[in-house]
């Protein structure tokens, strides 16, 4: 399926250079000043960073980030000793529905820092890496909006989206006239269901660090099963 995946043609190094010129916050300036891998870098040579957020809801304009999990990895190794996890105190009230999903209560966040207090550490961990997420509108949109609220300026960064990759794979596998006549539909691309197709173990969901590790393992499996690890980074980043 090497020709399957098509990503938008975004020149991320050029965009970072532009953002560096316009950024006002010193933490953002430092983030944009760190070089990204070249677009033609083979996937096998890229240092990725799996990222997962747990939030108070699904709307980045009115909900907030509660926990962040990060873990660096390559296609051959996950660096668990370098994994990081933060619990944050959101500006928004915790709703009962979200507490049921992620299990984080008011007592868990009462003494937690605001995102602004640990932003430098988070951006330092992300700098120079290529984030990998499962559904980019959570991690990218929530962080962008959170920074706009706190700094008056947002953030942009490239990602590999394992949900988007899996969606394209499943659409391809369910395509064709014969499958249409049989009524075959693309399989679910939720994180847990996607992992099971690659015989990856079930993890308890909705913990930011666990889900970040699960996402890293999923990308490794997707590339191993469907793509050539020497394909260029620019074929996948969004």
Positions of the model-derived regions?
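Short, conserved phosphate/pyrophosphate- and ester-handling motifs at nucleotide-, phospho-/glycolipid
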Residues: 211
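Short Asp/Glu-rich motifs
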Residues: 118, 214-215
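Conserved non-catalytic scaffold segment of RNase H-like nuclease domains
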Residues: 15, 19-51, 55-150, 156, ...
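Ser/Thr-centric signal marking residues that sit
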Residues: 53-56, 162, 215
């Amino acid at each position: 399926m090497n020709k399957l995946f098509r990503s938008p043609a975004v020149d991320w190094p050029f965009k970072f250079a532009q953002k560096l010129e316009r950024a006002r916050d010193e933490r953002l300036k430092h983030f944009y000043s760190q070089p990204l891998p070249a677009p033609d870098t083979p996937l096998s040579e890229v240092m990725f960073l799996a990222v997962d957020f747990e939030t108070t809801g699904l709307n980045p304009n009115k909900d907030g980030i509660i926990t962040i999990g990060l873990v660096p990895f390559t296609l051959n190794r996950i660096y668990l000793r370098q994994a990081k996890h933060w619990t944050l105190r959101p500006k928004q009230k915790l709703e009962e529905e979200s507490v049921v999903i992620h299990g984080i209560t008011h007592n868990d966040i009462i003494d937690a820092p605001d995102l602004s207090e640990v932003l430098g550490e988070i951006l330092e961990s992300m700098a120079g890496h290529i984030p990998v997420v499962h559904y980019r509108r959570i991690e990218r949109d929530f962080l962008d909006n959170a920074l706009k609220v706190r700094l008056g300026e947002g953030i942009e960064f490239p990602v590999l989206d394992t949900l988007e990759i899996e969606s394209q794979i499943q659409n391809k596998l369910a395509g064709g006239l014969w499958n249409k006549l049989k009524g075959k539909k693309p399989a679910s691309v939720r994180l847990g269901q996607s992992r099971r197709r690659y015989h990856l173990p079930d993890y308890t969901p909705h913990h930011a660090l666990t889900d970040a590790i699960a996402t890293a393992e999923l990308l490794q499996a997707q590339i191993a099963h469907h793509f050539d690890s020497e394909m260029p980074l620019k074929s996948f980043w969004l």
